Amino acid sequence: MGSHLDTVPNAGAFDGILGVVLAAGLVESLDGLKLPFGIEVLGFSEEEGVRFGVPFIGSRALVGRVDEELLGRKDGQGVSVRKAIQDFGLNSDEISKAALRDDVLAYIEFHIEQGPVLESLGQPLGVVEAIVGQNRLEFSFSGQANHAGTTPMNLRRDALAAAAEWIAAVENLAQRTADLVATVGFVEARPGATNVIAGEVRATLDIRHASDHTRTEALDELIRQAESIAARRGVIAKWRTLLVQHAVAMDPFLTEQIERAVQKASCQPHHMASGAGHDAMILAEKIPAAMIFLRTPGGISHDPSESVHLDDVAKALECGHHLLTRLAASQEFLGRTCRA
Protein backbone atom coordinates (compact mmCIF):
# COMPACT_ATOMS: atom_id res chain seq x y z
CA MET A 1 0.00 0.00 0.00
CA GLY A 2 1.17 3.53 -0.60
CA SER A 3 1.51 6.33 -3.13
CA HIS A 4 4.11 8.89 -4.19
CA LEU A 5 6.17 11.35 -2.17
CA ASP A 6 6.85 13.95 -4.86
CA THR A 7 4.54 16.51 -6.42
CA VAL A 8 4.70 19.41 -8.87
CA PRO A 9 6.06 22.94 -8.28
CA ASN A 10 3.72 25.28 -6.39
CA ALA A 11 1.52 22.34 -5.39
CA GLY A 12 -0.66 21.48 -2.42
CA ALA A 13 0.02 19.27 0.58
CA PHE A 14 -2.04 16.16 -0.22
CA ASP A 15 -1.28 14.89 -3.74
CA GLY A 16 0.51 11.56 -3.28
CA ILE A 17 1.70 11.99 0.28
CA LEU A 18 -1.81 11.56 1.71
CA GLY A 19 -1.86 8.02 0.30
CA VAL A 20 1.42 7.22 2.03
CA VAL A 21 0.23 8.65 5.35
CA LEU A 22 -3.12 6.85 5.06
CA ALA A 23 -1.36 3.53 4.44
CA ALA A 24 0.89 4.06 7.46
CA GLY A 25 -2.06 5.17 9.58
CA LEU A 26 -4.05 2.14 8.51
CA VAL A 27 -1.26 -0.21 9.58
CA GLU A 28 -1.02 1.62 12.91
CA SER A 29 -4.77 1.33 13.42
CA LEU A 30 -4.59 -2.47 13.19
CA ASP A 31 -3.23 -2.32 16.75
CA GLY A 32 -1.92 -5.86 16.96
CA LEU A 33 -4.54 -7.46 14.71
CA LYS A 34 -2.93 -10.46 13.03
CA LEU A 35 -3.40 -10.81 9.28
CA PRO A 36 -2.48 -13.78 7.04
CA PHE A 37 -0.31 -11.45 4.92
CA GLY A 38 2.25 -8.76 5.53
CA ILE A 39 1.76 -5.10 4.58
CA GLU A 40 4.50 -2.94 3.13
CA VAL A 41 3.98 0.83 3.00
CA LEU A 42 5.57 2.35 -0.11
CA GLY A 43 6.52 5.95 -0.84
CA PHE A 44 7.45 6.28 -4.51
CA SER A 45 9.80 8.87 -5.98
CA GLU A 46 9.37 10.76 -9.25
CA GLU A 47 5.74 9.85 -9.95
CA GLU A 48 5.12 13.25 -11.52
CA GLY A 49 8.24 13.21 -13.69
CA VAL A 50 8.98 16.87 -13.02
CA ARG A 51 12.72 16.59 -12.45
CA PHE A 52 13.75 14.23 -15.25
CA GLY A 53 10.79 14.46 -17.63
CA VAL A 54 9.91 10.79 -17.08
CA PRO A 55 7.05 9.88 -14.71
CA PHE A 56 6.73 6.85 -12.41
CA ILE A 57 10.46 6.21 -11.98
CA GLY A 58 9.97 4.75 -8.49
CA SER A 59 7.17 2.36 -9.41
CA ARG A 60 8.87 1.45 -12.70
CA ALA A 61 11.69 -0.05 -10.61
CA LEU A 62 9.26 -2.55 -9.08
CA VAL A 63 8.19 -3.88 -12.50
CA GLY A 64 11.63 -3.93 -14.13
CA ARG A 65 11.22 -0.87 -16.32
CA VAL A 66 14.28 1.15 -15.30
CA ASP A 67 16.78 0.73 -18.15
CA GLU A 68 20.07 2.37 -19.10
CA GLU A 69 18.32 5.02 -21.19
CA LEU A 70 16.21 6.10 -18.22
CA LEU A 71 19.20 6.08 -15.87
CA GLY A 72 20.97 8.39 -18.30
CA ARG A 73 18.19 10.99 -18.37
CA LYS A 74 19.32 14.34 -16.95
CA ASP A 75 17.55 17.09 -15.06
CA GLY A 76 17.83 20.82 -15.72
CA GLN A 77 21.15 20.96 -13.88
CA GLY A 78 22.68 18.12 -15.87
CA VAL A 79 22.35 15.54 -13.08
CA SER A 80 21.43 12.08 -14.38
CA VAL A 81 18.99 9.70 -12.73
CA ARG A 82 21.91 7.40 -11.99
CA LYS A 83 23.86 10.22 -10.30
CA ALA A 84 20.80 11.31 -8.30
CA ILE A 85 20.38 7.76 -7.00
CA GLN A 86 24.05 7.69 -5.99
CA ASP A 87 23.72 11.09 -4.30
CA PHE A 88 21.02 9.55 -2.09
CA GLY A 89 23.54 6.94 -0.98
CA LEU A 90 22.05 4.16 -3.10
CA ASN A 91 23.49 1.88 -5.77
CA SER A 92 21.79 2.19 -9.15
CA ASP A 93 23.26 -1.18 -10.18
CA GLU A 94 21.03 -2.86 -7.59
CA ILE A 95 17.71 -1.51 -8.85
CA SER A 96 16.76 -4.95 -10.11
CA LYS A 97 16.59 -6.08 -6.48
CA ALA A 98 13.55 -3.83 -6.03
CA ALA A 99 11.50 -6.01 -8.40
CA LEU A 100 8.26 -7.43 -7.01
CA ARG A 101 8.49 -10.91 -5.55
CA ASP A 102 6.20 -13.70 -6.71
CA ASP A 103 4.40 -13.77 -3.35
CA VAL A 104 3.08 -10.19 -3.59
CA LEU A 105 -0.72 -10.36 -3.59
CA ALA A 106 -1.81 -6.84 -4.53
CA TYR A 107 -1.21 -3.11 -4.48
CA ILE A 108 -3.80 -0.71 -3.06
CA GLU A 109 -3.49 3.07 -3.31
CA PHE A 110 -5.44 5.85 -1.62
CA HIS A 111 -5.29 9.15 -3.50
CA ILE A 112 -7.18 12.42 -3.71
CA GLU A 113 -9.41 12.51 -6.78
CA GLN A 114 -7.81 15.73 -8.10
CA GLY A 115 -11.10 16.59 -9.76
CA PRO A 116 -14.66 17.77 -9.01
CA VAL A 117 -16.74 14.62 -9.56
CA LEU A 118 -17.02 13.26 -6.00
CA GLU A 119 -17.72 16.70 -4.58
CA SER A 120 -20.46 17.29 -7.16
CA LEU A 121 -22.07 14.02 -6.04
CA GLY A 122 -21.63 14.74 -2.34
CA GLN A 123 -19.64 11.52 -1.88
CA PRO A 124 -16.45 11.23 0.20
CA LEU A 125 -14.97 8.15 -1.51
CA GLY A 126 -14.71 6.85 -5.05
CA VAL A 127 -13.99 3.37 -6.41
CA VAL A 128 -11.56 3.59 -9.32
CA GLU A 129 -12.38 1.16 -12.13
CA ALA A 130 -9.74 2.27 -14.62
CA ILE A 131 -6.99 4.79 -15.21
CA VAL A 132 -7.36 6.55 -18.53
CA GLY A 133 -4.83 6.21 -21.29
CA GLN A 134 -3.09 9.30 -22.55
CA ASN A 135 -1.02 10.61 -25.42
CA ARG A 136 1.22 13.65 -25.25
CA LEU A 137 2.51 15.23 -28.44
CA GLU A 138 4.31 18.36 -29.54
CA PHE A 139 3.02 20.04 -32.70
CA SER A 140 4.91 22.60 -34.77
CA PHE A 141 3.41 25.00 -37.30
CA SER A 142 5.89 26.58 -39.73
CA GLY A 143 4.81 29.59 -41.78
CA GLN A 144 6.58 32.78 -42.78
CA ALA A 145 7.51 35.57 -40.40
CA ASN A 146 6.79 38.96 -41.96
CA HIS A 147 5.99 42.60 -41.28
CA ALA A 148 2.65 43.00 -39.48
CA GLY A 149 1.86 46.31 -41.16
CA THR A 150 2.83 45.70 -44.76
CA THR A 151 1.64 42.13 -45.37
CA PRO A 152 -2.02 41.90 -46.57
CA MET A 153 -4.20 39.38 -44.71
CA ASN A 154 -4.74 37.23 -47.82
CA LEU A 155 -1.00 36.91 -48.44
CA ARG A 156 0.00 35.80 -44.97
CA ARG A 157 1.35 32.44 -43.88
CA ASP A 158 0.61 33.01 -40.20
CA ALA A 159 1.74 30.07 -38.08
CA LEU A 160 0.01 31.38 -34.96
CA ALA A 161 -3.33 31.84 -36.73
CA ALA A 162 -3.09 28.24 -37.97
CA ALA A 163 -2.24 26.99 -34.49
CA ALA A 164 -5.09 29.00 -32.96
CA GLU A 165 -7.63 27.53 -35.39
CA TRP A 166 -6.35 24.04 -34.60
CA ILE A 167 -6.52 24.67 -30.84
CA ALA A 168 -10.18 25.62 -31.23
CA ALA A 169 -10.70 22.36 -33.16
CA VAL A 170 -9.11 20.43 -30.27
CA GLU A 171 -11.58 21.92 -27.82
CA ASN A 172 -14.51 21.33 -30.16
CA LEU A 173 -13.71 17.64 -30.69
CA ALA A 174 -13.25 17.04 -26.95
CA GLN A 175 -16.60 18.67 -26.23
CA ARG A 176 -18.31 16.45 -28.82
CA THR A 177 -16.73 13.18 -27.63
CA ALA A 178 -18.07 11.72 -24.39
CA ASP A 179 -15.51 11.54 -21.56
CA LEU A 180 -12.64 12.71 -23.79
CA VAL A 181 -10.40 15.45 -22.44
CA ALA A 182 -7.87 17.26 -24.62
CA THR A 183 -5.60 20.10 -23.56
CA VAL A 184 -3.17 22.40 -25.32
CA GLY A 185 -1.17 23.43 -22.28
CA PHE A 186 1.87 25.08 -23.84
CA VAL A 187 2.18 27.44 -26.82
CA GLU A 188 5.30 29.28 -27.99
CA ALA A 189 5.25 31.68 -30.95
CA ARG A 190 8.38 32.98 -32.68
CA PRO A 191 9.87 35.47 -33.21
CA GLY A 192 7.46 36.78 -30.57
CA ALA A 193 7.45 40.47 -31.52
CA THR A 194 4.37 42.71 -31.48
CA ASN A 195 4.80 43.88 -35.08
CA VAL A 196 5.88 40.57 -36.63
CA ILE A 197 3.66 37.80 -38.01
CA ALA A 198 4.53 34.55 -36.25
CA GLY A 199 6.62 32.27 -38.43
CA GLU A 200 6.97 29.34 -36.02
CA VAL A 201 4.69 27.96 -33.32
CA ARG A 202 5.14 25.03 -30.95
CA ALA A 203 2.15 23.65 -29.07
CA THR A 204 1.67 20.60 -26.85
CA LEU A 205 -1.35 18.29 -26.88
CA ASP A 206 -2.46 16.12 -23.95
CA ILE A 207 -5.37 13.82 -24.84
CA ARG A 208 -6.96 11.25 -22.49
CA HIS A 209 -9.76 8.68 -22.45
CA ALA A 210 -10.51 5.39 -20.70
CA SER A 211 -10.91 3.70 -24.12
CA ASP A 212 -7.70 3.35 -26.11
CA HIS A 213 -9.77 3.02 -29.30
CA THR A 214 -11.71 6.24 -28.70
CA ARG A 215 -8.56 8.14 -27.77
CA THR A 216 -6.65 6.92 -30.82
CA GLU A 217 -9.51 7.81 -33.16
CA ALA A 218 -9.71 11.30 -31.68
CA LEU A 219 -5.95 11.79 -31.96
CA ASP A 220 -5.95 10.70 -35.60
CA GLU A 221 -8.71 13.22 -36.31
CA LEU A 222 -6.78 16.04 -34.63
CA ILE A 223 -3.68 15.22 -36.67
CA ARG A 224 -5.77 15.32 -39.86
CA GLN A 225 -7.22 18.66 -38.83
CA ALA A 226 -3.76 20.08 -38.12
CA GLU A 227 -2.63 19.05 -41.61
CA SER A 228 -5.78 20.39 -43.27
CA ILE A 229 -5.71 23.75 -41.47
CA ALA A 230 -2.01 24.17 -42.15
CA ALA A 231 -2.34 23.34 -45.85
CA ARG A 232 -5.21 25.80 -46.31
CA ARG A 233 -3.16 28.56 -44.70
CA GLY A 234 0.12 27.82 -46.49
CA VAL A 235 1.69 26.50 -43.31
CA ILE A 236 3.50 23.22 -42.62
CA ALA A 237 2.34 21.14 -39.63
CA LYS A 238 4.52 18.48 -37.99
CA TRP A 239 4.30 16.57 -34.73
CA ARG A 240 6.26 14.22 -32.51
CA THR A 241 5.10 11.86 -29.79
CA LEU A 242 6.24 12.56 -26.23
CA LEU A 243 4.26 9.91 -24.33
CA VAL A 244 1.91 7.01 -25.03
CA GLN A 245 0.23 5.47 -21.99
CA HIS A 246 -2.47 2.85 -22.54
CA ALA A 247 -5.59 2.75 -20.39
CA VAL A 248 -5.32 0.38 -17.42
CA ALA A 249 -8.23 -1.43 -15.79
CA MET A 250 -8.11 -1.95 -12.04
CA ASP A 251 -8.45 -5.50 -10.74
CA PRO A 252 -12.17 -6.46 -10.76
CA PHE A 253 -11.96 -8.59 -7.60
CA LEU A 254 -10.23 -5.87 -5.60
CA THR A 255 -12.62 -3.26 -6.98
CA GLU A 256 -15.58 -5.33 -5.77
CA GLN A 257 -14.02 -5.71 -2.32
CA ILE A 258 -13.41 -1.95 -2.14
CA GLU A 259 -17.02 -1.27 -3.11
CA ARG A 260 -18.25 -3.44 -0.24
CA ALA A 261 -15.77 -1.85 2.17
CA VAL A 262 -16.99 1.61 1.16
CA GLN A 263 -20.56 0.51 1.85
CA LYS A 264 -19.50 -0.94 5.20
CA ALA A 265 -18.11 2.51 6.03
CA SER A 266 -21.64 3.91 5.47
CA CYS A 267 -20.75 5.57 2.16
CA GLN A 268 -22.29 5.26 -1.28
CA PRO A 269 -19.64 3.85 -3.64
CA HIS A 270 -19.21 5.76 -6.88
CA HIS A 271 -17.39 3.93 -9.66
CA MET A 272 -15.20 6.17 -11.77
CA ALA A 273 -12.18 6.39 -14.03
CA SER A 274 -9.09 8.31 -13.03
CA GLY A 275 -8.23 11.07 -15.44
CA ALA A 276 -4.70 11.29 -14.03
CA GLY A 277 -1.95 8.71 -14.12
CA HIS A 278 -0.93 6.97 -10.90
CA ASP A 279 1.66 4.46 -9.68
CA ALA A 280 -1.13 1.87 -9.52
CA MET A 281 -1.23 1.73 -13.31
CA ILE A 282 2.45 0.76 -13.39
CA LEU A 283 2.17 -1.93 -10.72
CA ALA A 284 -0.93 -3.30 -12.47
CA GLU A 285 1.46 -4.61 -15.14
CA LYS A 286 2.63 -7.25 -12.64
CA ILE A 287 0.13 -7.57 -9.80
CA PRO A 288 -3.56 -6.91 -9.11
CA ALA A 289 -3.94 -3.21 -8.31
CA ALA A 290 -6.78 -1.00 -7.13
CA MET A 291 -7.38 2.58 -6.02
CA ILE A 292 -9.66 4.48 -3.66
CA PHE A 293 -10.25 8.17 -4.28
CA LEU A 294 -10.95 10.81 -1.65
CA ARG A 295 -13.09 13.83 -2.46
CA THR A 296 -11.13 16.95 -3.48
CA PRO A 297 -12.80 20.18 -2.24
CA GLY A 298 -13.36 22.50 -5.17
CA GLY A 299 -11.85 19.87 -7.46
CA ILE A 300 -8.55 21.75 -7.12
CA SER A 301 -5.19 19.97 -7.18
CA HIS A 302 -1.60 20.80 -8.16
CA ASP A 303 -2.20 24.15 -6.47
CA PRO A 304 -1.47 25.46 -2.95
CA SER A 305 -5.21 25.58 -2.23
CA GLU A 306 -5.50 21.78 -2.66
CA SER A 307 -7.25 20.30 0.40
CA VAL A 308 -9.20 17.40 1.89
CA HIS A 309 -11.95 17.01 4.48
CA LEU A 310 -10.79 15.41 7.73
CA ASP A 311 -14.03 13.42 7.89
CA ASP A 312 -13.23 11.96 4.46
CA VAL A 313 -9.80 10.87 5.68
CA ALA A 314 -11.48 9.15 8.63
CA LYS A 315 -13.90 7.41 6.24
CA ALA A 316 -10.96 6.30 4.08
CA LEU A 317 -9.25 4.76 7.12
CA GLU A 318 -12.47 3.00 8.09
CA CYS A 319 -12.89 1.73 4.54
CA GLY A 320 -9.29 0.50 4.48
CA HIS A 321 -9.78 -1.39 7.73
CA HIS A 322 -12.90 -3.10 6.37
CA LEU A 323 -11.06 -3.90 3.14
CA LEU A 324 -8.13 -5.58 4.90
CA THR A 325 -10.54 -7.59 7.03
CA ARG A 326 -12.37 -8.80 3.92
CA LEU A 327 -9.16 -9.70 2.11
CA ALA A 328 -7.83 -11.57 5.15
CA ALA A 329 -10.92 -13.79 5.07
CA SER A 330 -10.86 -14.38 1.29
CA GLN A 331 -9.33 -17.64 0.09
CA GLU A 332 -9.56 -16.35 -3.47
CA PHE A 333 -7.33 -13.42 -2.55
CA LEU A 334 -4.89 -15.42 -0.44
CA GLY A 335 -4.42 -17.93 -3.24
CA ARG A 336 -3.21 -15.32 -5.71
CA THR A 337 0.37 -14.95 -6.87
CA CYS A 338 2.25 -12.26 -8.74
CA ARG A 339 1.60 -12.23 -12.49
CA ALA A 340 4.66 -12.98 -14.62
Model-derived segments and their meaning:
Residues 69, 208-212, 242-244, 299-310:
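Short beta-alpha connecting loops at secondary-structure transitions
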Residues 129-131, 147, 151-176, 219, ...:
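His/Asp/Glu-rich mid-to-C-terminal helical/loop segments that flank catalytic regions of hydrolases
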Residues 2-3, 268-319:
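Zn-dependent metallopeptidase/amidohydrolase metal-coordination segment
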Residues 247-265:
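Short, low-order "capping/linker" segments at domain edges
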Residues 38, 95-99, 150, 171-184, ...:
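Flexible, glycine/charged-enriched surface loops at secondary-structure junctions
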Residues 6, 46-47, 51-213:
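Midchain, well-structured core segments that form catalytic/ion-binding scaffolds
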